[in-house]
């Protein structure tokens, strides 16, 4: 049954959903990687699609920018449409010198300056982590394709334009691999409602040095990331038998 933000019916979504921030990226993923594609959502322009990848039913839908937006869509997909696994696929900014442009980062955990998980967890710190099997499958999928990935902590920021640039030094000290805006929220939603989640990001810019990828470089690395995500789903299916 449709929700206030998703005009689909039960069964329209697969049990696994890839979620980029940009709904046009969702459209690109569906048109480039999936077959027999059907559009299943267009409320507020947040496009969602379902198709097949190598015969496996998979959905893809945008989640917008920031934890409040992605939390709405993740929650409704899980509680109203039976989604079991969410893979966020997006971009991040690096703060460490050893993390390079175009690196693919798998978010094993996600720190945040948001208070949403404290609200969920009775004002205590909650360790927002990805599902282990999904993480392992993504690493294995990358290795099978000959791609190197970095695995570690992300930082999910509430503000894109931060008033506290000194925080980047703290992130660097604590080994944060990338800064984005959603992973901690999605991990919190998945935990609250009994689902599983993973975040895979490509490094699109270096926050400290100011380096940025070109549009062509972003597209190539983005496609590598999507293939890792899709192949990891197939590996997960093999484990379930």
Swiss-Prot record:
GO terms for cellular component: cytosol. Its EC number is 2.4.2.1. It catalyses: a purine D-ribonucleoside + phosphate = a purine nucleobase + alpha-D-ribose 1-phosphate; a purine 2'-deoxy-D-ribonucleoside + phosphate = a purine nucleobase + 2-deoxy-alpha-D-ribose 1-phosphate. InterPro entries: DeoD-type (IPR004402), Nucleoside_phosphorylase_CS (IPR018016), Nucleoside_phosphorylase_d (IPR000845), Nucleoside_phosphorylase_sf (IPR035994). The keyword Transferase applies. A purine D-ribonucleoside binds at residues 5, 180-182, 204-205. Phosphate binds at residues 21, 25, 44, 88-91. Keywords: Glycosyltransferase, Transferase. The record marks 218 as: Important for catalytic activity. GO terms for biological process: purine nucleoside catabolic process. It is an enzyme of class 2 (transferase). The active site is at residue 205. Pfam families: PNP_UDP_1. GO terms for molecular function: purine-nucleoside phosphorylase activity. It comes from the Bacteria. Belongs to the PNP/UDP phosphorylase family. Homohexamer; trimer of homodimers. NCBIfam families: deoD, PRK05819.1, PRK13374.1. Catalyzes the reversible phosphorolytic breakdown of the N-glycosidic bond in the beta-(deoxy)ribonucleoside molecules, with the formation of the corresponding free purine bases and pentose-1-phosphate. This is Purine nucleoside phosphorylase DeoD-type. The gene is deoD.
